[in-house]
UniProtKB/Swiss-Prot annotation:
Pfam families: MFS_1. Residues 1-23, 76-86, 131-146, 191-207, 256-278, 334-341, 388-408, 500-514 are cytoplasmic. Gene3D superfamilies: MFS general substrate transporter like domains. Its main location: membrane. It is a multi-pass membrane protein. Belongs to the major facilitator superfamily. One of its GO terms (biological process) is response to antibiotic. InterPro entries: MFS, MFS_dom, MFS_trans_sf, Sugar_transporter_CS. This is Antiseptic resistance protein. The gene is qacA. GO terms for cellular component: plasma membrane. GO terms for molecular function: transmembrane transporter activity. Keywords: Antibiotic resistance, Cell membrane, Membrane, Plasmid, Transmembrane, Transmembrane helix, Transport. The lineage of its organism: Bacteria, Bacillati, Bacillota, Bacilli, Bacillales. PROSITE patterns: MFS, SUGAR_TRANSPORT_1.
Length: 514
C-alpha cells in the first residue's frame, strides 16, 4: 500500500508516546486558558489604556474571530509543512507576542497582540489533536489520549479566570499575557526533544490552494463576527445581515470547490461517515447548549451570590472535577458497552444537570448548582468519545482535516450558543422583570432602559435611586431567566443524544481502526 504520509512515529516506545501526550495536553491547556484569562484582566486594562467601547469589544472578540478563520487553512498548512514545526512555530509566536505586552501603551497595540495570539492559537490547537491521531495509531490508546486532551481543554477554560484572578491580586494586567511566556518556552524545548515530525509526503502534498484559503478565512470570520453582532445589537442592523449572507456564500463556494478538488484543503467527504458526523454534531450542539448556561452561571455567582470574579471561577470547579473524574474512564466504558451507548448517555447526564438547575432553582442555591455542575462535567467527559469517533474513520493523511473540523465545531457551537441562548436569556429577563411596574417610582426613560438591559444595570440603578425592590426583583428575574435557559439547554441536549444514538452504528468499536 502506498503511504501518502511521512512520519517518524513508528519506532516510538509507549513511554515516549505518553510523554509526547503530556506536551500536547499542556499546549492545549495554555491556549484554552488564554481564551478566558482576559476576562479577569479587562477591567484594569480598561482603566489604564482607556479604550473606547468598540475597542473593548475588539480586544475581547478578535482572538476568537482569528481562531475561527485560520484553523482550517493553518491545519492544512501544518499537514504539508510538518506538524511538529507548525506546533513549535505556533508556540514561539505565542510566547514572543505575549512578551510584547510590555510595550503596550494603546488599545490598538493590545488588539494587534490578540490578533497574533489568535494566529498562534490556530497553529497550536488543531495540531495538538492531529498529532494525537498520528502518534497513537492504536485506537484503544488513542481514545485514552483523547480523553486526556479533552481534560486539558476543559481545565484550561475553567482555570483561566482562576489563574488570572490570582495573578491580578499581586501584579498588573500585563501578567495575564506574560503567564504565557514560561509555558511557551517549556513547550518549545520539550517539543523539540519529545515530539515526532509528521507531514504529507511529496506525492500527496500539492500546491497551496489560495482561493480556498481566502474563502475559508473570510467566510468563517464573517460568520462568527455577524453572529456576535446579532447577540450584541439585535437583528435590526442591516450590516450583520449583509455580512452573514456573504459569509455563508463564501463557505458554500469553499465546500463546492473542495468537493471537486483532487487535493482539497478540507475533505468535506469525511461527513459522509456516520461516526464522523456523530462526533462533530455532538461537539457542536453540546457546546451550543452549554456555552450560554456556563456564562450565565458565572454571572449568577457574581450578581446573586455577590462573589468576586476570582471566587466565581473557584465555585465553577465542580464541573472541571466531574470532567477530570469521568473523562479517563469514558473510553474504557465505550470499549466495553460501545460508543452508541456511552456518548448519548453522557450527553443525557449533562442534560440532567441542566434540568436540576431548573426544577430546583426557584430560587437556585449554590449547593444545587454544584450538584448540577458535577453532572454537567461528568456528561461532558463523554465528548472524549466524540473525538475518538471523529478520528476513528479518519485516515492519517486527513488527521489535520478532522482536527480542524472538530475545533471549528467547538468554536462555532460556543459562538452560536452564546448568541442564541444568551439572547433568549436576555429576553426572558426582560419579560420576568416587568420594568413598567416601577414607572410610578421614577424608573422611566434611560433608567428603565439600563435596568432592562442587564441585571447588573438594574442593580446599579437600584443603588442610585435607593429603590431596593428593583434590585430584588431584577435578581429574581435573572435567576428565573437563567434556570429557564438551562431547561432549554437540557432539552436541546436530550435531542442531541437521540440524534447521536441514531447516527452511531450499533457494532462500532472505537478500539478498532476502520
Amino acid at each position: 500500500m502506498i503511504s501518502f504520509f511521512t512520519k517518524t512515529t513508528d519506532m516510538m516506545t509507549s513511554k515516549k508516546r505518553w510523554t509526547a501526550l503530556v506536551v500536547l495536553a499542556v499546549s492545549l491547556f495554555v491556549v484554552t486558558m488564554d481564551m478566558t484569562i482576559l476576562i479577569m484582566a479587562l477591567p484594569e486594562l480598561v482603566r489604564e489604556l482607556e479604550p473606547s467601547g468598540t475597542q473593548q469589544l475588539w480586544i475581547v472578540d478578535i482572538y476568537s474571530l482569528v481562531l475561527a478563520g485560520f484553523i482550517i487553512p493553518l491545519s492544512a498548512f501544518a499537514d504539508k509543512w510538518g506538524r511538529k514545526k507548525a506546533l513549535l512555530t505556533g508556540f514561539a509566536l505565542f510566547g514572543l507576542v505575549s512578551l510584547a505586552i510590555f510595550f503596550a501603551e494603546s488599545a490598538e497595540f493590545v488588539i494587534a497582540i490578540r490578533f497574533l495570539l489568535g494566529i498562534a492559537g490556530a497553529l497550536i490547537m488543531p495540531t495538538t489533536l492531529s498529532m494525537i491521531r498520528v502518534i497513537f495509531e492504536n485506537p484503544k490508546e488513542r481514545a485514552t489520549a483523547l480523553a486526556v486532551w479533552s481534560i486539558a481543554s476543559s481545565i484550561g477554560a475553567v482555570f483561566g479566570p482562576i489563574i488570572g484572578g490570582a495573578l491580578l491580586e499581586q501584579f498588573s494586567w500585563h501578567s495575564a499575557f506574560l503567564i504565557n511566556v514560561p509555558f511557551a518556552i517549556i513547550a518549545v524545548v520539550a517539543g523539540l526533544f519529545l515530539l515526532p515530525e509528521s507531514k504529507l509526503s511529496k506525492e500527496k502534498s500539492h500546491s497551496w490552494d489560495i482561493p480556498s484559503t481566502i474563502l475559508s478565512i473570510a467566510g468563517m470570520i464573517g460568520l462568527v463576527w455577524s453572529i456576535k453582532e446579532f447577540s450584541k445589537e439585535g437583528l435590526a442592523d442591516i450590516i450583520p445581515w449583509v455580512v452573514i449572507v456573504l459569509a455563508i456564500t463564501m463557505i458554500v463556494i469553499f465546500v463546492k470547490r473542495n468537493l471537486s478538488s483532487s487535493d482539497p484543503m478540507l475533505d468535506v467527504r469525511l461527513f459522509k461517515k456516520r461516526s464522523f458526523s456523530a462526533g462533530t454534531i455532538a461537539a457542536f450542539m453540546t457546546m451550543f447548549a452549554m456555552a450560554s448556561v456556563l456564562l450565565l452561571a458565572s454571572q449568577w455567582l457574581q450578581v446573586v451570590e455577590e462573589l468576586s470574579p476570582f471566587k466565581a471561577g473557584l465555585y465553577l470547579l465542580p464541573m472541571a472535577i466531574g470532567d477530570m473524574v469521568f473523562a479517563p474512564i469514558a473510553p474504557g466504558l465505550a470499549a466495553r458497552f460501545g460508543p452508541k451507548i456511552v456518548l448519548p448517555s453522557g450527553i443525557g447526564i449533562a442534560a440532567i444537570g441542566m434540568f436540576i438547575m431548573y426544577f430546583f432553582g426557584h430560587p437556585l442555591s449554590y449547593s444545587t448548582m454544584a450538584l448540577a455542575l458535577i453532572l454537567v462535567g461528568a456528561g461532558m467527559a463523554s465528548l472524549a468519545v466524540a473525538s475518538a469517533l471523529i478520528m476513528l474513520e479518519t485516515p492519517t493523511s486527513k488527521a489535520g482535516n478532522a482536527a480542524a473540523v472538530e475545533e471549528s465545531m467547538y468554536d462555532l457551537g460556543n459562538v452560536f450558543g452564546v448568541a442564541v441562548l444568551g439572547s433568549l436569556s436576555s429576553m426572558l429577563y426582560r419579560v420576568f422583570l416587568d420594568i413598567s411596574s416601577f414607572s410610578s417610582k421614577g424608573i422611566v426613560g434611560d433608567l428603565a432602559h439600563v435596568a432592562e438591559e442587564s441585571v447588573v444595570g438594574a442593580v446599579e440603578v437600584a443603588k442610585a435611586t435607593g429603590i431596593k425592590q428593583l434590585a430584588n426583583e431584577a435578581v429574581t428575574s435573572f435567576n428565573d431567566a437563567f434556570v429557564a435557559t438551562a431547561l432549554v439547554g437540557g432539552i436541546i441536549m436530550i435531542i442531541i443524544s437521540i440524534v447521536v444514538y441514531l447516527l452511531i452504528p450499533k457494532s462500532l468499536d472505537i478500539t478498532k481502526q476502520k
